[in-house]
Amino acid sequence: MESKQKVRKELRTERPSIYSFEIEELKSWLSENGEKPFRAAQIFEWLYEKRVTSFEKMTNLSKELRTKLNEHFVLTTLKTAVKQTSQDGTMKFLFELHDGYTIETVLMRHEYGNSVCVTTQVGCRIGCTFCASTLGGLKRNLEAGEIVAQVVKVQQALDETDERVSSIVIMGIGEPFDNFQEMLAFLKIVNHDKGLNIGARHITVSTSGIIPKIYEFADEKLQINFAISLHAPNTEIRSRLMPINRAYKLPDLMKAVDYYIKKTGRRVTFEYGLFGGVNDQVEHAEELAELLKGIKCHVNLIPVNYVPERDYVRTPKEQIFAFEKTLKSHGVNVTIRREQGHDIDAACGQLRAKERQEETR
């Protein structure tokens, strides 16, 4: 099995983003280049607390070290191509990468703080039939630094109003567990007290259900919140909505969930999108309650976002409430996700898909 370091280095460009480096990696690089390892903490402070935009601004570093940093690294490879702001304060960013690909990042405002939804891949290979992110397939994985830079860019926007990012959800474009090592590096960087210092319990990662990686993630014993994109109460419906279910079947997925809960002691959130006439009836709620019986979990009901390229219709409000009521009657912990950014292209992949359409006209 290839080492984590080798896998990560293979992803890096000729002059990588310094945001890709965990603090211990940066210490090693400094030692190898004749510098004191303690400088890593100073560099992290400039990157994540002061959020400077050039190495020259790192004024407590020697000119020689600043030159070395400039020769070996770039600060960020993201350029803001589009920025949309919703009436409810939701902000959606379309970032252009160094190779011309684009990715999405969303800032969501809540009563409890500001949450950033980050992307982990350019496109997605999973092929969920309700998701705009899969249109065009998977182009490439993001480096950890490209994921970190999304949060930094959003934080820089919030700096203008003296606000801060308080939580992160890894639920943007792509399957995080398909880019596992870079995702782990991202988690360690944003969670580090010298990094963005986002508490582990304020970070959520979601997967469509890549079972081997769920076991691996459980063994990491992180205090990160964990979510599963479930979207169905049985194998037949899940296979229709999510082709990944044909490779990683629902019964095996539930075994992996059980392992995760026992290994970490933490509950799992199940994301359940409601699609009119497909999975939103009371009998589906009854079946879902039976599937989740005895499992330490929370269900997040998601009214589907309309995607023009897909053919699903929205579940009526009264049906959503009936579904919720049925789950509650069986003792299932459940909430309905509050919609945000409804007046902009806020659904995952919509803004990128729109831009791609305009580019090909």
UniProtKB/Swiss-Prot annotation:
Gene3D superfamilies: 1.10.150.530, Aldolase class I. Disulfide bonds join 117-348. PROSITE patterns: RADICAL_SAM. Binds 1 [4Fe-4S] cluster. The cluster is coordinated with 3 cysteines and an exchangeable S-adenosyl-L-methionine. Keywords: 4Fe-4S, Cytoplasm, Disulfide bond, Iron, Iron-sulfur, Metal-binding, Methyltransferase, rRNA processing, S-adenosyl-L-methionine, Transferase, tRNA processing. It holds the Pfam family RlmN_N. It is an enzyme of class 2 (transferase). GO terms for cellular component: cytoplasm. It catalyses: adenosine(2503) in 23S rRNA + 2 reduced [2Fe-2S]-[ferredoxin] + 2 S-adenosyl-L-methionine = 2-methyladenosine(2503) in 23S rRNA + 5'-deoxyadenosine + L-methionine + 2 oxidized [2Fe-2S]-[ferredoxin] + S-adenosyl-L-homocysteine; adenosine(37) in tRNA + 2 reduced [2Fe-2S]-[ferredoxin] + 2 S-adenosyl-L-methionine = 2-methyladenosine(37) in tRNA + 5'-deoxyadenosine + L-methionine + 2 oxidized [2Fe-2S]-[ferredoxin] + S-adenosyl-L-homocysteine. [4Fe-4S] cluster binds at residues 124, 128, 131. GO terms for molecular function: 4 iron, 4 sulfur cluster binding; metal ion binding; rRNA (adenine(2503)-C2-)-methyltransferase activity; rRNA binding; tRNA (adenine(37)-C2)-methyltransferase activity; tRNA binding. Its EC number is 2.1.1.192. The active site is at 104 (proton acceptor), 348 (s-methylcysteine intermediate). NCBIfam families: rRNA_mod_RlmN (TIGR00048). Belongs to the radical SAM superfamily. RlmN family. Reaction proceeds by a ping-pong mechanism involving intermediate methylation of a conserved cysteine residue. This is Probable dual-specificity RNA methyltransferase RlmN. It comes from Bacillus licheniformis (strain ATCC 14580 / DSM 13 / JCM 2505 / CCUG 7422 / NBRC 12200 / NCIMB 9375 / NCTC 10341 / NRRL NRS-1264 / Gibson 46). The lineage of its organism: Bacteria, Bacillati, Bacillota, Bacilli, Bacillales. The gene is rlmN.
